[in-house]
Amino acid sequence: MPSGVPLIDIVRRAVRRWTSLPRKGFTIRTYNLCFLGFGNVNRTLAQLLRDRKQELCDSHGISFRITGVATRRLGWIADPNGLDLAHVGRTLLSDKSQEPNRDPLTVRNWLQAAQADILFEATSLNVNNGQPAADHIRAALNHGAHAITANKGPIVHAYRELRDLAAAKGKRFLFESTVMDGVPIFSFFHQMPTIHLQGFHGILNSTTNVILSEMENGLSFDAALKKAQQLGIAETDATHDIDGWDAAVKTAALITVLMDVPVKLEDIAREGIRELTTNAVRNGRRDGWPFKLVCRAQRVGNGVKASVAPEKVLSSSPMGRVSGTSSYIYFETDLFPGLAITEENPGLYATAYGMLADFVRAVS
């Protein structure tokens, strides 16, 4: 050992030299990425991909270029050599050299023009039939691309078909961002072989949680909804949230995938928060039993009994402590009596991260 040089410094130098050497067999592959829907989620994902670009390359051997962007309003553009996202919005609107194609046939054609390896699907939820998102995913898999979505509809209405199609094509159909943003619920259970999920309960809709909190503070339902909309938490049309549809779709997705029991939305007993009064909500909080919109599912024989409804929960319980835009879920399995996950006030980056993580899983 050189005189006067601490051992830790020698180790650090050795590590730096080792990590700077080319890794044997470490092949970097470039993937063509396409974004279908370019609203908040996919825009945030694009930013996150840029932020993590070097790390993806260094740690996972993943390089990428964005070769296609499509929106319902503006049509689509594709360039297999790569698009400059900083100019995509202007290109969609005005650049005649890459004028967006609005042919309704064409998700498959667009993917072919972009030479897509990955589709990131983030279009609006259709609770009735999961369309057109299910067709988008079907087109991607038939084209030969991995399909990654943040849309819950295809999971509820076409999961087994799309899963089997992906397997037949040797591709991945992944959807981690559909429930609790980017929390890895589906991949978590995928890593638990032979575990059997018996049931779950939790709070999976953040909009109703915020509205109920504002009602506890004395606002009427309408005023609380308006405040949530002004904060950007509730949509202009918040029907899916306040009438329990969003929570029911998430419940159905969890049952379908994790319990392997296909369930229709009409099979889930559903009640929203629209009928709750400010007095009832305030009194519940005062008495230590606040209202929450609770999702429940329990295996019964070969089926599952499921519900979404406002319930009074003990304020000191895990569900009672959920506030703001946070979420909570508790799983009962045959071997683990209870597994709980809490997500604290996630933002768009959490949802985007779930899609990025699915990308890494798909190509690894």
Region locations from a protein language model:
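N-terminal glycine-/serine-/threonine-rich beta1-alpha1-beta2 phosphate-ribose binding loop
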Residues: V11, G25-N142
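Conserved active-site and cofactor/substrate-binding residues in soluble primary-metabolism enzymes
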Residues: L36, N40, T44, F64, ...
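Rossmann-fold NAD(P)-binding glycine/threonine-rich loop
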Residues: N126-A139, K152-F175, F188
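Rossmann-like NAD(P)H-binding beta-loop-alpha module
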Residues: A167-A234, W245-D246
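Substrate-binding/catalytic subdomain of NAD(P)-dependent oxidoreductase enzymes
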Residues: E214, L225-R321, S326
